[in-house]
Amino acid sequence: MVNGTKGVCVSGKPWKTEKKAYNRSGLADAQRTPYEKRMEQKRKLDEIKEREKELKREKEEQRAAHAEKIRTRRQAKADRERMELLQAKLHQKVIDRRRRREKRNKMLKER
């Protein structure tokens, strides 16, 4: 930088980026934050992330429970329909058997 002006490189090449200090001691006092304050911010951020994870997990559990409830309801409905069909078929067999018996009895009476 020439004459302390920012944004212009000594070489005059505008595509060169401005170099910054790697460690915190090179920063200005106004930019430095104490270690405790940084750790407090990091702790708060970690708490927020943990809470978000917990909320997501709870939401996923609720969604899974709802899906399972729907699945069991559909399964119960299918079982009910299947049993009704089976009962109707068995009832028809009983009716047919009674008719055959009545025919036999009628034929025996006519003799």
Swiss-Prot record:
Keywords: Coiled coil, Nucleus, Ribosome biogenesis, rRNA processing. Its main location: nucleus. Residues 34-80 have a biased composition (Basic and acidic residues). One of its GO terms (biological process) is rRNA processing. Residues 21-80 are annotated as: Disordered. Residues 35-93 form a coiled coil. Involved in nucleolar integrity and required for processing of the pre-rRNA for the 60S ribosome subunit. It holds the Pfam family Cgr1. Belongs to the CGR1 family. This is rRNA-processing protein cgr1. The keyword Coiled coil applies. The keyword Glycosyltransferase does not apply. It comes from the Eukaryota. GO terms for cellular component: nucleolus; nucleus. InterPro entries: Cgr1-like. It is found in: Nucleus, Nucleolus.
